Amino acid sequence: ILRVSKQAGDGGIERFIRRDSIMFVNARFLIDKFAKDENVKTVIYGHAGHINPISSYPAVPCIPFGRYMRKAYGESYSPLLFLIGSGEAMAYDEHYNRKDNWLSSPPENSMEYFLSLIDDNVFYTPLTVDFNELTLSRLQGSHHIPQEFYPFNLYQRFKGVFFIKSTDCTHI
């Protein structure tokens, strides 16, 4: 790990851009060490901007962790997306203080709005070819920012969606 860290360089931006490749090196090491058999499944929980195999948009442009995983494991790599319709989310403010903020209401043309029309509070749905188009979806990172919704082709990025209609920071 120290060798990989040294290869990432000393500059903050360099290290930030290379973090997904370092995530992959660490994940591959652990998978090869503990889950090499094909019948063993591995679950890796990560941010949607990292786990998808397409792009880190709208964050800092870099090759996402998911692209390295897809190249190494092919279609066996199945990234899943977690979305929340409404409620509170924990993130940091500009001074790195932890804050619970209310999520903005999903716009009518967003995936969260569409999924909120379903009666269940928590459910999973696969992303079929019917979703092969640009649609707005929430991207919440480590910091609260005013813009929460961005256009994505979720079908190309994820195999399915776990949706939570409403939550606060302590209850689902």
Language-model features: where?
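A charged, amphipathic alpha-helical module
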Residues: 1-40
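Residues that mark the start of a beta-strand
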Residues: 39-41, 75-76
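Catalytic core of tubulin tyrosine ligase-like
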Residues: 47
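C-terminal regions of proteins
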Residues: 52-172
